[in-house]
């Protein structure tokens, strides 16, 4: 399933920068960054549960927020890209 994840981490207080880096790293382990605080992830239900648990453990729920947008398996018809940065083919081959 295709999931769009966005986050807002308060960085003005102590520990904020660290939480921000950790949230970004967790997201990067599961998907592709498309904007500063937005990631596209293609995951199965088990991976999604693990991803959510990891992210929730990294944030301070009194100061930070996470949003999960579930676009399902037919996501290609729901996503439109306009402008700079060519879109990344989530299901294509990955060369490291």
Segments predicted by a language model, with ranges:
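Extended, hydrophobic alpha-helical segments
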Residues: 1-34, 38, 42, 46-47
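Short acidic, gly/pro-rich beta-turn/loop elements at beta-sheet edges
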Residues: 15, 49-51, 78
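Intrinsically disordered, low-complexity boundary segments flanking structured domains
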Residues: 25-28, 52-57, 80-83
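Short, intrinsically disordered low-complexity segments
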Residues: 35-65, 70-72
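C-terminal structural segments of small proteins and small subunits
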Residues: 58-96
């Amino acid at each position: 399933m295709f999931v769009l994840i966005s986050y807002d981490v308060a960085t003005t207080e102590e520990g904020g920068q660290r939480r921000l880096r950790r949230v970004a790293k967790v997201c990067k382990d599961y998907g592709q960054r498309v904007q500063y605080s937005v990631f596209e992830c293609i995951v199965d239900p088990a991976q999604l549960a693990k991803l959510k648990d990891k992210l929730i453990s990294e944030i301070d729920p009194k100061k930070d927020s996470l949003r999960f947008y579930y676009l399902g398996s037919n996501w290609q018809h729901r996503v439109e890209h306009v402008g700079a940065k060519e879109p990344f083919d989530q299901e294509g081959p990955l060369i490291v």
